[in-house]
Amino acid sequence: MSKNQKATLIKVIFLSASGFFLFVCMDSTAKYLGNVMPVTQAVWGRFFFHFIALCIYFLLFKPKLNLTRNFKIQIVRSLLMVTATFFMFNSLQRFDLVDIYVVFFSAPLIVSLLSAYFLKDILSPKGIILMLLSFGSIVYALGPSMKILSPELIFPIIPPLCWALYQFFTKLISGNNEPFSAVFYTAVTGALIFTIYISFNWTPIENNIYWIGLVAMGIFGFI
């Protein structure tokens, strides 16, 4: 392995680990806030302050975007992300975070299957074995701690499905897509939908520290 390849690998590992850490921080904050306010307000804060952070970034750096490119797919991707977040935050109030992540990590398996079927990606024998092992470990880990026949299981199941479809559509347009366009559409779509909803269902926030949590989730989501 060359030095450039090693540097790239280290960068990928660092970014992946950092992204996962931020996801855990956001979900942990959401789990806490869901106990002190309606979940819909926590979801609103995640997207509204994501949008505010995005506006500040655009004012400072003024990146050029083509928001008309792949418009329909961008809207679909944004709705998938908003749906995944809504169900994820709801599932956090019903199950342990570790159990939810066990289910959530089935998303790469779903993405691989979708890519193989629709994009004709070739799955190697090693890849198939790894997917089967992944699925088996998910089923094994799910059984002892979660009620498989519980209707509430729909909440942790929906997020990986939506996330897998989100990644699939991302891969579909990856060669003709600007990364910040996706961030823009996701922030605007989520903020718009939940701002309209909570304007009719707002519950006063009793402690100012909860606002810090809402802002933090928006920043985590933006990063």
Feature locations, PLM:
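Loop-to-transmembrane-helix transition segments
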Residues: 11-18, 58, 64-87, 151-159, ...
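Hydrophobic/small/kink-forming positions within alpha-helical transmembrane segments
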Residues: 20-25, 55, 78-86, 108-113, ...
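Glycine-/small-residue-enriched transmembrane alpha-helix faces in small-molecule transporters
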Residues: 1-41, 147-172, 216
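Structural motif at transmembrane-helix junctions in multi-pass transporters
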Residues: 35-41, 87-104, 175-180
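Hydrophobic transmembrane alpha-helices of multi-pass small-molecule transport proteins
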Residues: 126-142
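C-terminal transmembrane-helix exit sites in multi-pass transporters
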Residues: 88-90, 107-129
